Amino acid sequence: MRIGPVELSAVKDWDPAPGVLVSWHPTPASCAKALAAPVSAVPPSYVQARQIRSFSEQAARGLDHSRLLIASVEVFGHCDLRAMTYVINAHLRRHDTYRSWFELRDTDHIVRHSIADPADIEFVPTTHGEMTSADLRQHIVATPDSLHWDCFSFGVIQRADSFTFYASIDHLHADGQFVGVGLMEFQSMYTALIMGEPPIGLSEAGSYVDFCVRQHEYTSALTVDSPEVRAWIDFAEINNGTFPEFPLPLGDPSVRCGGDLLSMMLMDEQQTQRFESACMAANARFIGGMLACIAIAIHELTGADTYFGITPKDIRTPADLMTQGWFTGQIPVTVPVAGLSFNEIARIAQTSFDTGADLAKVPFERVVELSPSLRRPQPLFSLVNFFDAQVGPLSAVTKLFEGLNVGTYSDGRVTYPLSTMVGRFDETAASVLFPDNPVARESVTAYLRAIRSVCMRIANGGTAERVGNVVALSPGRRNNIERMTWRSCRAGDFIDICNLKVANVTVDREA
C-alpha cells in the first residue's frame, strides 16, 4: 500500500537491490554500561508495558511477536560512513528513550534501567560485504528483541551510485512519527555534514521519560468514577470485559505461524473524491465515513448490528512534537448500523470518534486496574489505523518526501492486534496485518472485499440505502449500547438510539 511517496508493506515483500551492507551496533563497552545501569523510579509507559508483557506471553507459548518498526529511504551517492556514524550517535544521545531497557520481573512488575550519561551510548559501523535481498532482510529483522537494551539498529546498503539507509527499531522506542520526523532528522544532520557545514542545531527533543512521569501522574489521579474511566468500562462490558475481537475466524492461535500483510485498493482518485463529498454531505469527515463503511461491511459479513472498534491516536502534546517514543493511545468507537443509512451511520461514527478522543489519554490497562472484573486486551484484538495524507500532519510529511523512495515495513511476525490500516493520498487503499494461515487469509480477504464493495457503493451514490436489520439486539445489550453512546456524546449532540435517529451533530471539519 502506498501513501503518497511512502510505501507500506511486509518486509518479505521489500526487495532491496543487493549491495554492501554496513550496519551500526553498540560497542561492547556501551553494552556493559547499559547492563550495569541502575533501576529507575520511572515506570514504563502503559503501551511499553503492554508490549513487554505481550512479547513475553507469546514467547512463553512458543510464538513469535511483531516488535520492529523498520523504515528506509533511498539516497544518491556513496555514504560517508564517518558522517553517518556521527549522525546515528547524535540521534541516540539526543532522545532519552534509547537510554532505557526493561526487566520483566513478573506480569505486574516491570522495571526500567536507565543509562545516566548519554555519552555512554556509542554505535560503530561493521562492514558485512555484499548481500542478497534475502540476506539483507534477514539481517535487518534479527535486531535484538524487546528485553534487550540494544533492540534498535541502523544500516546502509551501498551500491554503485546510491545507498539505502534503514532503521530497525523496537516499537518500545518509536511509533509512526519516526517515519516522518525521525528520518528527516537523520537526513538534515547528514546533509549538513557532507556539505562541509558544522552539525546543525535541532529544536529541543523533549523527553519520553518525562512523558512517562506525566502519564502516571495523570492516571494515578483517576478513579473508577472518573467519566473517562466509566466510558471505557461501559465499552468493555459490552465486549466481554475487554477490547473487541476481530469478528471473523483467524485460525488456531496456538499454532506457530508468521505474520503477513494483505493490501487492496478500495477506491481510485475519482471515487475517493466522490466518497469524501458524501462524507461531507453527511456532516462527517473522511474517517467517520470509513468507520461507517467498515461497520457496514462487518454487518454484511456477520450480521452484527453494531460495530465496536478501537482506533489509535497520537497523544503527543505540542512540546512532544520532536520527541522519539511511543505516544499511542486508543479511542473506542461504537457504530450502530441496522436500519440506518450511510449518512446516519457516518454521523454517528464521526461523533463516536470525536467524543472518544479524550479517552486516548486513559490507557485501558489503568481501567483494568481500577475495575478488576475487566481483562487486558487479548492477542489479535481488532485495531483500525487511518493515514490521511490530504490533511496534517501527514500531508506535510508527504511533501517533505516528494521525489524520495521511502518505505516502512512490518517485520513478518504475528502482530498483537489484528491491525487494519486505511491510507488515503489521491487513491484510498487498505492493508491488514494478520496471522499467516489459510483461515485468517480467507477471512481477511473477505473483509477487505466487503469494505471495498461498501466504499464503492457510497462513492457511486448509495448513501441513502438503509442497512438491513439482520440481527435484533437483546434488550440488555440494547440498553448497554444506549447507555454507552449517550455517555460519550458532547453537550449539544443528540443520538436517539431508541428511534435510530440522529440530529444536531456538529463537526469541526478542520479537526
Swiss-Prot record:
Methyltransferase as UniProt keyword: no
Source organism superkingdom: Bacteria
Pfam families: Condensation
KO phenotype (gene knockout): Null mutant does not produce SL-1. Disruption of the gene does not alter the virulence of M.tuberculosis in mice.
Enzyme class at the top of the EC tree: transferase
EC number: 2.3.1.283
Molecular function via GO: acyltransferase activity, transferring groups other than amino-acyl groups
Job description of the protein: Required for the biosynthesis of sulfolipid-1 (SL-1), a major mycobacterial cell wall lipid. Catalyzes the acylation of trehalose-2-sulfate-2'-palmitate (SL659) by adding the (hydroxy)phthioceranoyl group at the 3'-position to yield the diacylated intermediate 2-palmitoyl-3-(C43)-phthioceranyl-alpha, alpha'-D-trehalose-2'-sulfate (SL1278).
Name of the featured protein: 2'-acyl-2-O-sulfo-trehalose (hydroxy)phthioceranyltransferase PapA1
